[in-house]
Regions:
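Catalytic-core region of carbohydrate-active enzymes that cleave or remodel glycosidic bonds
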Residues: 83-86, 93, 176, 181-194, ...
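Aromatic-rich peripheral "rim/lid" segments of glycoside hydrolase catalytic domains that contact
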Residues: 274-316, 320
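Hydrophobic faces of well-ordered beta-strands that scaffold small-molecule active sites
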Residues: 25-29, 57-59, 95-99, 158-162, ...
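Aromatic-lined substrate-binding rim segments of carbohydrate-active enzymes
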Residues: 41-108, 183, 187
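Active-site neighborhood of glycoside hydrolase catalytic domains
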Residues: 129-199
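N-terminal carbohydrate-binding accessory modules
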Residues: 1-56
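Aromatic- and acidic-residue-enriched segments that line the glycan-binding/catalytic groove
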Residues: 71-79, 90, 101-125, 132, ...
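Non-catalytic C-terminal accessory domains or segments of carbohydrate-active enzymes
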Residues: 302-856, 862, 868-902
Length: 902
């Protein structure tokens, strides 16, 4: 798999994809490069996904991040699609490209650009105005994608997906016409790989007799909303408990038993919804409970995915399976369900066994040929095989799940896995008795009646090795047995000289055989050795450029003499030396707002009705699509006015605060969602605020209002839910009807580095208080914790220096903690990048990942916190500290990411 410049053919039949007429089981992980704003780390994530068994990545490309204005499409810097696709090809991963135009993906407006909220045309239909913009976007993406098509030898783009994966109802002709137009546009742009939409393969609706089975998203976690109602307030830690290895194994084995051969794990790596990128329902972390966590760390549920990924990649029998028998059957013990499949070409048989009870079951499986009872853990599932070729020998049956089978050098290697403490048993068909060497003390074996029987307790002593030689074949077979934890240290890798298998390190990133030296790169966490089964001719081994003395072990491997040391302890600095400055001068009646936009429109494309007789106050209509928005209303004579009712519309956890002549009137915020409202995209409310009697006077008065809109809802075809108003909707007064002249101001024009989602309309953002080069020497020096009781905005800044070694890959987070009764929010800016929003009294997120590249691992860093408090309680920050999430010796070279410009 490479960009070789040659022509290739991609097709499918009812069994699988056909790549150059060879069957392929696609094992794809969804990855969001836009949620990792450090392009160097894209390679790190891709290498980890490939090493853990994935052969493809499913890549959404969000229109909104790339298009700050109509007709403008930016693919530079952290938006460099060409770089990502090139890196994926270099890392030997196929790409399923998903340019939308609508994505969902818990993105602001589902991935539709902010400017589209104020434009004519009904989204996701055949409306000509919408299609004009959508086709222009697809054309911009396709101009890059066409250079990376696998069919043309330019890259590894193997499949192309339209829209968000949802099917189109048959009774919605506008939506169906819209999909057909998008498909025609893609084909006109010379995209000649198979195209999928929400109904399956485009042109062959769904999975039918002529189409390969497609799984749109098997397992991989779930999004968690503000407040964490579904997770009990525990956030993604709880999501991981639900989507554990057992859950992931059951989901994927069910898909395999259903003869699915195009698998999509949604989520492989989620990342961080930095800035104002997230949809209204979700908070900053998009960890998702994915198999690769937000901090780029493999999660415990990775074990199940890795084992099956390597299995479908190295055992071609699984690319063509037919149902054998009459569907699911109960075993002799009715607590087990067995699905029986077979490959009609090779005769290999596969059994998927489910235990639907809450207790371990050990029982025989009549009719499978497996001659001993099989153990399946509580609620778990297991894939067993019989009649499977292991290189030059045949597996009669096994009670352990096969993980891989390769031929390397002058030997075959097969790996079998199971839960810790289980006993793995297998039998090989052997007409003549073979020789057997145990490289470890745990395995036992016996030969009788033409079969070699091997029994191994899994997990005792780590990896167990059995060498089978002579007998029916001159080619030795190395049998390896591992429990889940041990299997996570087994790394197969394809090289031009042939496949190899490495055991020991935390990660294998690359392997290259030059002359007689095998050059390995990867990561080491704990003290470990290195063991290699590889092609012929290996005389020497290096690890990350350093020679590794080896000897030939009893299992025909090269074994490191001694051990590589564990990664050294990492010390992170305390955060002190804080500087402080209050903000929101916009609430002062004397503030100069003459350069602000007059809110004088009377019509809107919003789905929110314009109040009768009132101006349009919706922020989007004035070009302010992301982040905080300020309003200032001038009026004459407030005598008799007892209160003001401010109607506003936001996403989840939006808020409004108001001042009259600089005097705080109060704050209103949307409620914390429960499980029933967690998916609600737009929230509306009216803040009824009393006017102090001393402010009910003649003369000019200024009503200042700050709204935090919290992003736009996604939309179904034809609904235009993303066009619901954000910001103020109307203002009404009790006791009078003053004429109000409104002015509005939000975020400045997007700058080059970060694009449209980094900043909103806070005064400090517009003045560059978040930037590393801002001069804060005149700011007040303070210590944390703080307890300011003030309605409005305050900023805190500090600097810290890291001196991590060049061979160290450390994942670092920022942790904020305080009394949960205190009502305030914090925007976190690192070196100018808006890396998240912390809501102290809502949660559930307290630790925010600081991506290397934006974080200077060997240099000075500037941290700025913009604190928005409602004045009802003391407001922090209280505890702010750096947190080490993980550290290994290895990693990838990391280029510094530019800080945003003014």
């Amino acid at each position: 798999m490479c960009a070789d410049g040659g022509r290739h053919h991609v097709a499918f039949d009812r069994h699988s994809l056909l790549v150059d007429d060879r069957r392929l089981v696609l094992w794809s992980a969804e990855m969001h490069p836009f949620r990792l704003p450090s392009p160097s780390l894209w390679r790190d994530v891709l290498q980890k996904l490939r090493a853990h068994g994935f052969n493809a990545v499913d890549v959404p490309v969000p229109w909104n991040l790339h298009s700050p204005a109509p007709g403008v499409h930016d693919f530079t810097g952290v938006r460099d699609l060409n770089r990502f696709l090139s890196t994926a090809a270099e890392e030997q991963l196929y790409v399923v490209l998903r340019p939308g135009p609508y994505l969902g993906a818990d993105l602001d407006a589902g991935g539709l650009p902010g400017w589209l909220t104020a434009a004519a045309g009904t989204a996701r239909t055949d409306d000509p105005e919408y299609l004009r913009h959508a086709e222009e976007w697809l054309g911009a993406v396709d101009a890059i994608a066409v250079r990376h098509l696998f069919t043309a030898g330019g890259g590894t783009v193997l499949l192309y997906r339209l829209e968000d994966g949802s099917p189109v109802p048959a009774d919605d002709p506008a939506a169906r016409a819209h999909r057909a137009r998008l498909y025609a546009k893609v084909r006109a742009d010379r995209i000649d790989v198979p195209v999928l939409d929400g109904d399956g393969w485009f042109g062959d609706r769904g999975t039918g007799p002529r189409t390969a089975g497609f799984s749109a998203g098997a397992g991989g976690g779930a999004a968690d909303p503000w407040g964490g109602a579904p997770s009990g307030g525990e956030g993604y830690a709880r999501v991981r408990e639900v989507h554990d290895a057992v859950h992931e194994r059951r989901r994927r084995l069910t898909a395999l038993a259903d003869r699915i051969t195009v698998h999509h794990t949604g989520m492989g790596f989620g990342g961080t919804s930095w800035g104002w990128l997230p949809g209204p329902g979700v908070y900053t972390s998009y960890d998702y409970g994915a198999v690769l966590g937000e901090g780029r760390l493999p999660a415990p549920n990775m074990a199940a995915v890795q084992q099956l990924g390597h299995l479908v990649r190295t055992v071609p029998d699984l690319a063509r399976l037919e149902e054998a028998g009459d569907g699911p059957r109960r075993a002799a013990d009715g607590r087990l369900t067995v699905r029986h499949l077979a490959n009609p070409d090779t005769g290999a048989r596969v059994y998927v066994v489910h235990n639907d009870t809450d207790e371990e079951v050990r029982a025989p499986l009549p009719g499978t040929g497996i001659e001993v009872p099989v153990t399946v853990a509580a609620g778990d599932a297991k894939l067993l095989a019989a009649g499977l070729r292991l290189g030059h020998r045949t597996l009669a049956w096994t009670t352990a799940q096969p993980m891989l089978s390769i031929s390397t050098g002058r030997q075959d290697v097969a790996v079998f896995v199971g839960r810790h403490g289980e006993s793995a048993q297998l039998a090989l068909d052997c007409e003549r008795q073979p020789g057997v060497d145990r490289a470890d003390t745990e395995p036992a074996w016996a030969y009788e009646r033409g079969r070699l029987n091997v029994v191994v307790p899994l997990g005792e002593g780590g990896l167990s090795r059995v060498l089978v030689k002579d007998g029916d074949s001159e080619t030795p077979l190395v049998l390896l047995f591992a429990d889940d934890e041990t299997a996570l240290r087994l790394w197969p890798y394809e090289t031009p000289a042939g496949p190899l298998l490495v055991y020991g390190p935390a990660l294998l990133r690359s392997a290259e055989l030059r002359d007689s030296t095998l050059h390995l790169t990867g990561d080491v966490g704990i003290e470990t050795g290195v063991e290699v089964w590889g092609p012929r001719g290996i005389a020497e081994v290096t690890w990350n450029g350093e020679p590794v003395p080896t000897y030939v072990g009893r299992a025909r491997s090269r074994v490191m003499e001694g051990l590589m040391p564990a990664v050294r302890a990492v010390a992170l600095p305390a955060l002190d030396g804080w500087r402080f400055r209050t903000e929101n001068p916009e609430s002062d009646p004397d503030f100069d707002d003459s350069a602000w936009t007059v809110a004088g429109r009377t019509t809107s494309h919003s789905t929110t009705p314009v109040p009768e007789g009132g101006p349009v106050l919706f922020a989007d209509d004035y070009g302010f699509h992301h982040g905080d928005v300020w309003y200032r209303g001038r009026m004459e004579d407030t005598r008799g006015i007892r209160s003001v009712a401010l109607s506003y519309s936001t996403g989840t956890q939006g808020l409004l605060m108001a001042w009259l002549d600089g005097r705080p009137l109060g704050t209103h915020r949307m409620p914390v969602p429960d499980e029933d409202t967690a998916g609600q995209g737009t929230w509306t409310a009216t803040a009824r605020l009393d006017v102090p009697e001393e402010l009910r006077t003649p003369g000019e008065h200024v009503l200042s209002v700050l709204v935090r809109p919290m992003q736009h809802a996604g939309t179904a075809p034809g609904e235009d839910a993303h066009k619901a108003a954000r910001g103020l909707v109307a203002a009404e007064f009790t006791g009078g009807t003053p004429a109000v002249e409104w002015r509005i101001r939000g975020a400045a024009e997007p700058e080059r580095v970060c694009g449209p989602y980094n900043n909103g309309g806070l005064y400090g953002e517009r003045r560059g208080w978040h930037l590393p080069d801002h001069d804060d020497r005149r700011w007040r020096t303070v210590d944390l914790p703080r307890a300011e009781r003030r309605q409005g905005v305050a900023w805190y800044r500090t600097r810290f220096r890291l001196g991590l070694g060049p061979d160290l890959d450390a994942s670092v987070g920022l942790t904020l903690e305080d009394d949960p009764e205190r009502a305030y929010r914090v925007q976190i800016f690192l070196n100018g990048w808006n890396l998240g929003q912390y809501v102290n009294d809502v949660g559930p997120q307290h630790t925010f990942v600081l991506p290397n590249g934006i974080l200077r691992a060997r240099g000075s860093n500037t941290l700025a916190l913009a604190v928005l408090s409602d004045g009802t309680t003391p407001a922090g920050p209280h505890t702010v500290r750096l947190t080490l999430l993980d550290a290994v010796r290895g990693g990838v070279p990391v280029e510094p990411v530019d800080s945003p410009e003014r």
